[in-house]
């Protein structure tokens, strides 16, 4: 299972069966995102959200990257992740790739998600005062999309504050006449 997407259609799942040869996904845009997510889930036959065995991989890099899934002629399978092909140094220079995070779950696909989230919270995004509640932000994008009416925004911000939000994020559409995803973003 791999993932791709675009604006308002993020994280579309693509199930591609193993077959002899190479399946390659690559992003040379210089960034990762929902259109080129640097990750993969390999569920065993019969695995679903809460049952079965699954392996998850996430390449910890936000730049150009590639993923290769290969079934060898003898039936063995291998996975490779790394920087995009043009990411190399000159002679006599070293190059170190990003980390590849890998998990195994015998509790289905959700078990992979839980393991990734636990590792992220315990080892990557640690908070100095873990016993205190974490800051809450409210992003209004999905509540209003392109309809930036000041009265509605104030009402939503007040309700977010009442729920404990410490920051109100006005996401998208604050410049010009932004009424579609094809204009005005940053036209200020």
Descriptions of predicted regions:
Residues 26, 122-124, 154, 174:
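Residue-level detector of functional hotspots within protein domains
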Residues 79, 125, 140-143:
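A general structural-boundary detector
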Residues 1-120:
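N-terminal accessory beta-strand-rich subdomains and adjacent acidic, glycine-rich linkers
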Residues 131-188:
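Aromatic-lined carbohydrate-binding/catalytic grooves of carbohydrate-active enzymes
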Residues 120-130:
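Long, charged amphipathic helices and adjacent flexible linkers at domain junctions
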């Amino acid at each position: 299972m791999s993932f791709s997407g675009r604006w308002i259609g993020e994280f579309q799942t693509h199930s591609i069966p193993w077959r002899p040869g190479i399946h390659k996904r690559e992003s040379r845009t210089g960034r990762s995102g929902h259109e080129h997510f640097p990750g993969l889930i390999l569920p065993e036959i019969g695995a679903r959200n809460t049952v079965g065995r699954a392996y998850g991989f996430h390449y910890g890099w936000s730049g150009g990257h590639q993923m290769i899934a290969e079934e060898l002629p003898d039936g063995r399978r291998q996975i490779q992740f790394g920087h995009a092909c043009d990411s190399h140094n000159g002679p006599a220079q070293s190059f170190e790739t990003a980390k590849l995070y890998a998990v195994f779950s015998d509790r289905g696909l959700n078990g992979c998600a839980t393991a990734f989230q636990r590792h992220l919270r315990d080892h990557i995004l640690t908070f100095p005062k873990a016993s205190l509640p974490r800051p809450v932000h409210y992003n209004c994008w999905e509540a209003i999309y392109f309809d930036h009416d000041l009265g509605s925004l104030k009402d939503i911000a007040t309700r977010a504050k009442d729920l404990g939000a410490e920051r109100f994020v006005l996401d998208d559409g604050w410049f010009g006449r932004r009424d579609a995803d094809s204009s005005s973003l940053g036209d200020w």
